[in-house]
């Protein structure tokens, strides 16, 4: 299989037929073997019923139905886990991103890149969405240095090796380019056409921005020590232990010089607390190291209710 397209679906019943018609037309023009994996993320409308009809009409379609709404990251992860293509494409189901841009992104990938991120330009959303997205992207660029204008664009093309090295949860789907870039993959972007939403309602809200920023802080904090937790915890613990020891040394010196009783002084209690906390952090680092060594892969964080696939796609 050359190409796997993963499409997360949540209450998009009105756009699915047109989406697949336009997507399949553009994929056929490429001349490679492809599959489309629709992941119904607990839709409340008739999305799954429409997907079943599409599945029956084309053998290149696979449908996964999650038991409830797990969120976009887990929907994508379910699709990635079932994708067989050497190249992975992600595309939202709302038709705001144009399927006609897929061949152009693949051309960019052939220039030697590992991931090509879409850049919705000009963006056809309301000003609040555009404003929050602009702020979000500026913050990501300022702290990470990744020169992308639209990191959260749902239209992405990347090599399979990327999904084999990153783990998605929470709101981390928006950081796929950053996670790949931090691991040494070549990442670029290309402007893509963007259309106003014609069907359904937008899933964007300000709480997603906040959750996304919190996930970014988590990534930035732990990424440097993911494979060696002792670097983060042990160094911090050692610093705290030395600080506590320094306070004890200072108080002991005052006792020797001025005969001051220190055992019940608040500063002495604080020093002992710091030393104990430092030791605990050091051992936490060692424990984290052990967990990394014995854990080969994370447990699946989503639950599949139904899977539809044709025998030749197994």
Say what each PLM segment does.
Residues 12-27:
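Short, well-formed alpha-helical segments that are part of the catalytic scaffolds
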Residues 40-49, 95-96:
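A conserved acidic beta->alpha catalytic loop
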Residues 53, 60-82, 87, 96-179, ...:
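Acceptor/aglycone-binding surface of glycosyltransferases and processive sugar-polymer synthases
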Residues 20, 32-42, 64-65:
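Short beta-strand/loop segment that forms part of the nucleotide-sugar
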Residues 175-314:
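Hydrophobic helical membrane-anchoring modules
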Residues 14-18, 45-54:
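Acidic helix N-cap motif at the loop->helix transition within catalytic regions
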């Amino acid at each position: 299989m050359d190409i796997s397209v993963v499409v997360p679906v949540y209450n998009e019943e009105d756009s699915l037929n047109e989406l697949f018609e336009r997507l399949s037309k553009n994929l056929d023009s490429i001349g490679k073997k492809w599959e489309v994996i629709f992941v119904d993320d607990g839709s409340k409308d008739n999305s799954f019923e429409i997907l079943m009809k599409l599945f029956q009409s084309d053998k290149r379609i696979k449908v996964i139905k999650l038991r409830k709404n797990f969120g976009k990251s887990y929907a994508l992860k379910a699709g990635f886990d079932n994708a067989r293509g050497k190249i992975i494409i992600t595309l939202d189901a709302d038709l705001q991103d144009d399927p006609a841009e897929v061949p152009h992104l693949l051309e960019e990938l052939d220039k030697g890149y590992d991931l090509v991120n879409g850049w919705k330009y000009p963006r056809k959303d309301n000003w609040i969405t555009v404003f929050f997205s602009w702020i979000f992207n500026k913050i990501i660029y300022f702290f990470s240095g990744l020169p992308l204008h639209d990191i959260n664009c749902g239209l992405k093309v990347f090599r399979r090796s990327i999904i084999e090295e990153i783990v998605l949860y929470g709101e981390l789907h928006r950081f796929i380019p950053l996670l790949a870039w931090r691991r040494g993959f070549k990442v670029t972007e290309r402007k893509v056409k963007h259309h106003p939403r014609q069907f359904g309602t937008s899933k964007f809200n300000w709480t997603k921005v906040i959750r996304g920023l919190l996930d970014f802080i988590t990534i930035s904090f732990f990424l440097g020590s993911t494979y060696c937790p002792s670097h983060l915890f042990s160094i911090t613990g050692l610093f705290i232990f030395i600080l506590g020891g320094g306070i004890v040394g200072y108080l002991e010196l005052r006792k020797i010089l001025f005969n001051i009783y220190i055992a019940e002084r608040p500063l002495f209690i604080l020093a002992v607390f710091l030393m104990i906390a430092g030791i605990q952090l050091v051992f936490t680092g060692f424990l984290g190291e052990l967990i990394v060594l014995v854990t080969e892969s994370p447990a699946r964080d989503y639950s599949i209710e139904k899977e539809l696939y044709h025998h030749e796609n197994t």
